[in-house]
Amino acid sequence: MLQAHAKVWHTYDNQWRSKQKGMVGISLNGDWGEPVDFTSQKDIEAAERYIQFYLGWFATPIFNGDYPQVMKDYIGRKSAQQGLGTSRLPTFSSQEKSYIKGTCDFLGIGHFTTRYITQKNFPASHGPSYFTDRDLAELVDPRWPDPGSEWLYSVPWGFRRLLNFVKTQYGNPMIYVTENGVSEKMTCTELCDDWRMQYFKEYINEMLKAIKDGVNVKGYTAWSLLDKFEWDEGYSERFGLYYVDFRNKNKPRYPKASVQYYKRIISSNGFPNQKEAENWHRKAIETCSSSNQLLAADPLTSHMEMVTEIVVPTVCTLCILLSAIFLMFLLRRHN
């Protein structure tokens, strides 16, 4: 993937950049890892490994030309303990390092949550695994809000720390936040998504703090516009600003309260003041009630569509068949 990305960057750089003045970047997911115990050097190092094995796996080669040293050390040692002659982590030639390094005009960041990290040794006998290679354990604070997805906890302060990490680690590149949002479970049909508005408010506020820290953030995009297919979770999780009724063949969309709230944040380029933000929240909740009524009526609409599209044609077909049978019966009697 890294070499393919570099190929695209160099192709654009050589053939089109001078005319189009465009940019080529890459979007990477990265969650923040916080040490469980700040007095423990092992926990501090484990938290660093968590980030390097996550974001650094791809970002470090692009900015520095090679995999993070901690990845090379840990995976190399685990590979040797498992009887392998070489590390399971691929190596780059000098030419490849040079070719990959610097192929990023901007960095896209997808961020959703944070974990507490502590040191945990995994014997080589556990077998090769990305998770056991890291020698760490992920923990969560039970007090963190958990809106829907079992992996996604709302931890806004981790966002600011991750953005500052990118600034320090990679020379303060231009950043576009390409994914940030929160989900609810498929069974939820509530359009007044107060928890999503709170998530956006707190996470965007932490991003603004990072900008004041000097992080070169240029843009922000919520994840996502519509409820849709979510990787391993399929349609069982909803991240959308718009509710999609997957039961209906027409897949109608209904705006959640967060639509108006997010719209006001973006059009104002942030939060004018606390009172105004609270007013946005109140208006968004007020406007979602009518949408909820539409959504509540939708099962009836779907039922009527089913009657029109399935039941009526079936009854007509049966009537035609019965008429044909009756006609055949009359003809036989006549003969």
Language-model regions, residue ranges each:
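N-terminal Sec-pathway targeting helices
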Residues: M306-V312, L330
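Active-site region of glycoside hydrolase catalytic domains
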Residues: M1-A297, P313-C316
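Single-pass type I membrane-protein transmembrane alpha-helix
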Residues: L318-H334
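N-terminal compositionally biased, intrinsically disordered segments and leader/signal-like regions
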Residues: S302, V315-L318
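Extracellular Ser/Thr-rich, low-complexity/disordered mucin-like segments
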Residues: A297-T308
